[in-house]
Amino acid sequence: MHVTQEQVMMRKMVRDFARKEIAPAAEIMEKTDEFPFQLIKKMGKHGLMGIPVPEQYGGAGADVVSYILAIHEISRISAAVGVILSVHTSVGTNPILYFGNEEQKMKYIPNLASGDHLGAFALTEPHSGSDAGSLRTTAIKKNGKYLLNGSKIFITNGGAADIYITFALTAPDQGRHGISAFIVEKNTPGFTVGKKERKLGLYGSNTTELIFDNAEVPEANLLGKEGDGFHIAMANLNVGRIGIAAQALGIAEAALEHAVDYAKQRVQFGRPIAANQGISFKLADMATRAEAARHLVYHAADLHNRGLNCGKEASMAKQFASDAAVKAALDAVQIYGGYGYMKDYPVERLLRDAKVTQIYEGTNEIQRLIISKYLLGGT
């Protein structure tokens, strides 16, 4: 894929910002597991929170490839910050940009694009993970408002976000065709944030429960029409999956970089361990998988950029890159030996952060199912 001068400049700017601002913040996040509010504000001031948002709504007006470049570079330094940005943009802002009316766009997107507000995506429920069409949260219209009742779990940016793209049943007897999408503001009466989950990795990125107890959402906050919700969710998951693939690619490349440096410096039996085929072959395989993942990620991003169907390619990129990230992190820990198991060394964190990329935004089993349906004519 040809990279434009603008994309090269974007990559350099993000890389410099990540090393200067994100790296030290990531160390604090790892120790405290606290959300990096001040860092997000800085990212907003640098134009990173609205990269693909048109300038008329306060964004940078860049393309999807530039946005994916940013997630990729940030995730090399901090996968936690990478997922905060990915969820905010791909599924917290884009649903309004793609499916909102002009009034909704003008009301919400400028604050999201500037980083003054943070976005989240509330789809997953205790009883519906991979089966996104089996929601139980309901939205009953009454006196010009929708009353939402139910709960969501595993919501990235939960408790930190100002805007939640929320999915609920307006016609429970119609299954997925009865799902609608709503813009829910954080101070909505009847809406509360539940417990914050304690996770294996991605420290500092909030993952929470959301509770709706007759939450009063104005009729004006319905996205699209009643019954459009499932389509809205699935349409935005494509770019969301490319974003997670870029996050995984960043992890894989970071693991490779650390492993190469360590293998060249660590001396055993009178020579660097990189001189041993058992190590050098691991590094070669890590590099090959990372390069293959990079091509899949940017091919999918380029297709999306050109308005072409990228469902299969997004799933391929997400599945392959996340598998590559986990394998790279595992191999990096092995190359580090006992040091790799210790929190004082970076590869331990990479391994913990990598695992979830195989799970969220659709498990890799779901990705393989999607790919096979494209191949067999099921979509």
UniProtKB/Swiss-Prot annotation:
Keywords: FAD, Flavoprotein, Oxidoreductase, Sporulation. Belongs to the acyl-CoA dehydrogenase family. Signal peptide: none annotated. One of its GO terms (biological process) is fatty acid beta-oxidation using acyl-CoA dehydrogenase. GO terms for cellular component: cytoplasm. It catalyses: a 2,3-saturated acyl-CoA + A = a 2,3-dehydroacyl-CoA + AH2. It is an enzyme of class 1 (oxidoreductase). SUPFAM superfamilies: Acyl-CoA dehydrogenase C-terminal domain-like, Acyl-CoA dehydrogenase NM domain-like. CDD domains: SCAD_SBCAD. InterPro entries: Acyl-CoA_DH_CS (IPR006089), Acyl-CoA_Oxase/DH_mid-dom (IPR006091), Acyl-CoA_Oxase/DH_mid-dom_sf (IPR046373), AcylCo_DH-like_C (IPR036250), AcylCo_DH/oxidase_C (IPR009075), AcylCoA_DH/ox_N (IPR013786), AcylCoA_DH/ox_N_sf (IPR037069), AcylCoA_DH/oxidase_NM_dom_sf (IPR009100). Pfam families: Acyl-CoA_dh_1, Acyl-CoA_dh_M, Acyl-CoA_dh_N. Induction: Subject to catabolite repression. It comes from Bacillus subtilis (strain 168). GO terms for molecular function: acyl-CoA dehydrogenase activity; flavin adenine dinucleotide binding. It comes from the Bacteria. Its EC number is 1.3.99.-. PROSITE patterns: ACYL_COA_DH_1, ACYL_COA_DH_2. Its cofactor is FAD. PANTHER family: ACYL-COA DEHYDROGENASE, ISOVALERYL-COA DEHYDROGENASE, MITOCHONDRIAL-RELATED. This is Acyl-CoA dehydrogenase. Transmembrane segments: none annotated.
